[in-house]
Amino acid sequence: MDCNLQSQQNIPYNVLAIPVSNVNALVDTAGDLKKAWEEFQKTGSFSLTALQQGFSASQGGAFNYLTLLQSGISLAGSFVPGGTFVAPIVNMVIGWLWPHKNKTADTENLIKLIDEEIQKQLNKALLDQDRNNWTSFLESIFDTSATVSNAIIDAQWSGTVDTTNRQQKTPTTSDYLNVVGKFDSADSSIITNENQIMNGNFDVAAAPYFVIGATLRLSLYQSYIKFCNSWIDAVGFSTNDANTQKANLARTKLTMRTTINEYTQRVMKVFKDSKNMPTIGTNKFSVDAYNVYVKGMTLNVLDMVAIWSSLYPNDYTSQTAIEQTRVTFSNMVGQEEGTDGTLKIYNTFDSLSYQHSLIPNNNVNLISYYTDELQNLELAVYTPKGGSGYAYPYGFILNYANSNYKYGDNDPTGKPLNKQDGPIQQINAATQNSKYLDGETINGIGASLPGYCTTGCSATEQPFSCTSTANSYKASCNPSDTNQKINALYAFTQTNVKGSTGKLGVLASLVPYDLNPKNVFGELDSDTNNVILKGIPAEKGYFPNNARPTVVKEWINGASAVPFYSGNTLFMTATNLTATQYKIRIRYANPNSDTQIGVLITQNGSQISNSNLTLYSTTDSSMSSNLPQNVYVTGENGNYTLLDLYSTTNVLSTGDITLKLTGGNQKIFIDRIEFIPTMPVPAPTNNTNNNNGDNGNNNPPHHGCAIAGTQQLCSGPPKFEQVSDLEKITTQVYMLFKSSSYEELALKVSSYQINQVALKVMALSDEKFCEEKRLLRKLVNKANQLLEARNLLVGGNFETTQNWVLGTNAYINYDSFLFNGNYLSLQPASGFFTSYAYQKIDESTLKPYTRYKVSGFIGQSNQVELIISRYGKEIDKILNVPYAGPLPITADASITCCAPEIDQCDGGQSDSHFFNYSIDVGALHPELNPGIEIGLKIVQSNGYITISNLEIIEERPLTEMEIQAVNRKDQKWKREKLLECASVSELLQPIINQIDSLFKDANWYNDILPHVTYQTLKNIIVPDLPKLKHWFIDHLPGEYHEIEQKMKEALKHAFTQLDEKNLIHNGHFATNLIDWQVEGDARMKVLENNALALQLSNWDSSVSQSIDILEFDEDKAYKLRVYAQGSGTIQFGNCEDEAIQFNTNSFVYKEKIIYFDTPSINLHIQSEGSEFVVSSIDLVELSDDE
């Protein structure tokens, strides 16, 4: 909107861009990987472009080098619906590790990347000889694995790798045996090389390299076994040969199961070795050292180990997502930075009070994931009268989505608080104590400390902080961990604190960035169209009365385990997003004898299963006798393996499912619950409409039938061959139009209705009604063309997203049981993120005094807010529409989403699949541009929606009574808007005028004018503005966001120009005393505008700086400009040069024209009294016209 503020063209910065975080870069690259994988399955050709970009990004430090590899491995079981190619995941792994097909160069890059990560996170490095050995080992696996991968591809595709347009084929017995031979040879070679490398130095520094090699070998097994499972019965072996090959395959599967556990134990031996793992002591530095080690090993080794079991293709047959709830820890910050001391850590979650009990023996392994999303952190700050240098945080409040917890040396509730919104990826603090101040700042909140560091800072070595030899300043340097976010804070106190002991100290626990505290399954991957197999840690369940479950540490699972005793009850509620068939299973360890547990499953409040299940002992002997086909890995509390809890051919509808597990007579340990889709989703039809009636497919997009309760899920395709069917369908096509000219749609025809009629036309028999079908399809496409022309929304059927603003986990999917064509799917996002879709219709497209109809079709939804707004949320509804499976397509004038007598097909019901609202437009205001806004937003972290057929169309002119009503709304809205504009203009116009005065021709793009000084810029304060965020979507910029960003960037632009002209480095003192040589008592002072200034406190205090003038000309004039107060002198060169002298009780501005005889000069600032404060100093070359 235009508030009559002076408009400015964009300055040379992208002022509206939101900086892309590491996590966003990861998500984008992971999406590219999935698309490349999908294309690989369709064509047999793997594009390395995305992998090359991902590798380059990881080398640039954008994200952890293993994160994308884990993302790629999750695709191991994915498939293209309708396809037959068994794509080897090892091809993805090879491509990620060696993306440029240059074995030597890529391996060197990989080794370098890993080595840098390990040195950064663990302060460990390989010896040169060991590095060479691991390089040779990884290269050998590359060679042998690539041979097998190529054989698997060639067995299923015609031609060779150089052939264009290769076609899929069924492997022959020769093809199959070639793959077997290549695999046997490759695995034998890998084992030999592995035995050699393991005889060397296998320690912490080598563990990440071993994990890479192990993952590659297991990926090779996965690819080979998956290929054999798919083709062993199809290639045409004789009975004897088939039996031989099946026996060989069984031995290979046994080897893979055994290898997974053996590899896991090798890693755990190194990880837990007392020579490597520090001991948790009573002092702070010992806990920090332990946390550094565990975090480095978790991110670089253990997170990958945790997913090895999911590579076993007999257990994980589809695309997989195993949630990891393990926690890592930052270094402790605050209290007294850089100083060791006896430590006490407090348990934030033991009570709702601000006072808490101690965590026994500082054992951070007792800290586990808190199952909620940290929305924001509020710090309570103590600010005595002594000034800002004496302030410090003394307490905090952690605000979660469903709870809050606090800590303080007194209750922070009701006190002034400083808030930091989530997601928070790092926490750091600085402390400073001297004769003149005693302060602390945490994440920039607290004291304004003038100190600076004179030493470097290492997050992996004592003292875990940078320090100053000049001013007792100390600051932590916790990094922003890739793909991690803070889950909770734990307060600590220590001895050896200088000054006030009330200063806050905190330890932060971190979890994976995309971890959602809500349990959801049935996510549909928009790239692969697969329903994802989901593993949910048991610690995300709950005990009776919603109590947090007791947990024990497990290193190998990516989550803590829940010990389950006799009589215990564990609940887990999860939201299903896709109606299909599922199997539910448990991953557990039972170190005792066989036991039975009770399993009760309810769905949307109704019981669907109640049984007792035997959980077999998982000791080594029991596994070999009772569960010989199972993969297991040995953890701290026993061997973990899988067992089915529930399996059925019925379709689980969407909504909440609750598992209630009741303990038996033996103690067991539950790792996670898994939800496995067992029925594929429909394959895409790729329908495209055009005016010639050719939409690329003659059949409706439905494939098969299933039963959900008493309701039939039909997926045809049906075929109408009776003349009576043709007549009924023809009548329905004609009814779409207002007249036989077919130039205007009937008044009440909707997008959904056109799609339904299209399905019926597509189901007409080609053999019997070829010409009639062609003509009817042409009319249906004409109806779609007219529909698009009248719809004020662009992409109402999501055929384009050009005008839509989409949030996290907002996907455009195609054809399902309920939709013909594209539809929007909003899926749950991690906590503070919001899945949303938003579009604004511009004022210029509207008519005055007109009623508009807003309608749409919802496949299913849960806790989704719909808003339609012009004058202020005229329509604001929460959409909760349960899934109802489609009925068969018939020739009658009925719809397939549900039976007509069902309430969900009644648009007047709150849970209807259809919605239909009206919104009135009064007078038009092009200068304010209110338009019509429509938005959909998930309001709970387990919310979801599938929706399409959205329309906003002109309905009719308003009546006289309606005009009167809308005029009252319009006038009230306009009056408030103009008052707001006037208020903002009054606030901003003086600031804009000040900024205009900085630049030539008042153009913020231009050069700054000669009069501009640092003090000029420091005196311009951009005020706090309203509506910086969008009124409905917090993640979108609000009305005044753009002007605020432009002003800030203009000031930054001016500051940068001034800094470039200034021959004195750090003359603004914004970076403390960097670039200055200090003598005596020199420190930083915080002025009233929060700007930093140089303070010389004694007669003998001074700072100096050497300056070299490039392209020196002794006839060139320079201007020295100083803003200072107190008593002091500023002088260049030797004693004969005239000095600028200050002797004033207030700040004054002085300038002087200077000539130099030599290009190398020395600037000296000297105190001549008890205090000399310099706010800024600059030396600029004068132009000829100055």
Swiss-Prot record:
* UniProt xrefs under InterPro entries: Cry_V, Galactose-bd-like_sf, Pest_crys_dom-III, Pest_crys_N_sf, Pest_cryst_dom_II
Kindly state which keywords UniProt assigns to this record, in alphabetical order.
Answer: Sporulation, Toxin, Virulence
Q: Which GO terms describe its molecular function?
A: signaling receptor binding; toxin activity
Q: Tell me which Pfam families the record gives.
A: Cry1Ac_D5, Endotoxin_C, Endotoxin_M
Highest taxon, organism lineage: Bacteria
Q: Which GO terms describe its biological process?
A: sporulation resulting in formation of a cellular spore
Additional free-text comment from the UniProt record: Toxic segment of the protein is located in the N-terminus.
According to its UniProt entry, the function of this protein is described as:
Promotes colloidosmotic lysis by binding to the midgut epithelial cells of insects.
Family from the record:
Belongs to the delta endotoxin family.
Name under which the protein is recorded: Pesticidal crystal protein Cry14Aa
Whose protein is this, by species?
Bacillus thuringiensis subsp. sotto
Taxonomic lineage from the root: Bacteria, Bacillati, Bacillota, Bacilli, Bacillales
